[in-house]
């Protein structure tokens, strides 16, 4: 089975296993955390860094870090790409300089099939024989994928030929959103993808510790990537305040009786030993 077939099979299996049907996927961060149990964080990173999956085999812990970006469709592709590495357990893959490993190629294909399943595309477009950029826009807006991913899928499903695919792959999402009237939605997506985001399970544990008075507001603020003041205000509005640490006080009357044996002091000591 080639890489494309492996990726498609895994994407179909993932959707089936988690009863996702053919519909567009919503919050991918929450989806990955809930289905895999792994922590996912949206973090600051260099412009050339998109995502990274780290795995500790000794503790069986996996962490996925994704760069925050004003390009929401790219971020969704990166999230799906890193999910592929988790599902295929690509922990030890090595890439030669200047080339892309088979694992990376397979992860790209998985992301495309997961985000835009062929049957879902056919369900949206039906038996149309001729498509326009308005149809491309509808696919991009519905499934929240890049025009490049949409164009590849449309070509694979034989809605368009290779020449149109190449033309449409050069279009960016902002162009489509502006032309077809959903720029406001796109800007809302940009706001979400360009914001830091702490792993939900880790943040929940930290907030629980804050409530118990053993985790500081600074720790919460660091996780959320904001100020201490904002963290405290946000928690207070939710009715979450730290419990004061109560140090038990014990009075002398509460202490148990202590018996001291002083009999050894009564032993006569020899005088002027020689």
Specify the residue positions occupied by each region the protein language model found.
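Active-site hotspot residues in diverse enzymes, especially metal/ion-binding acidic/histidine motifs
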Residues: 1-274
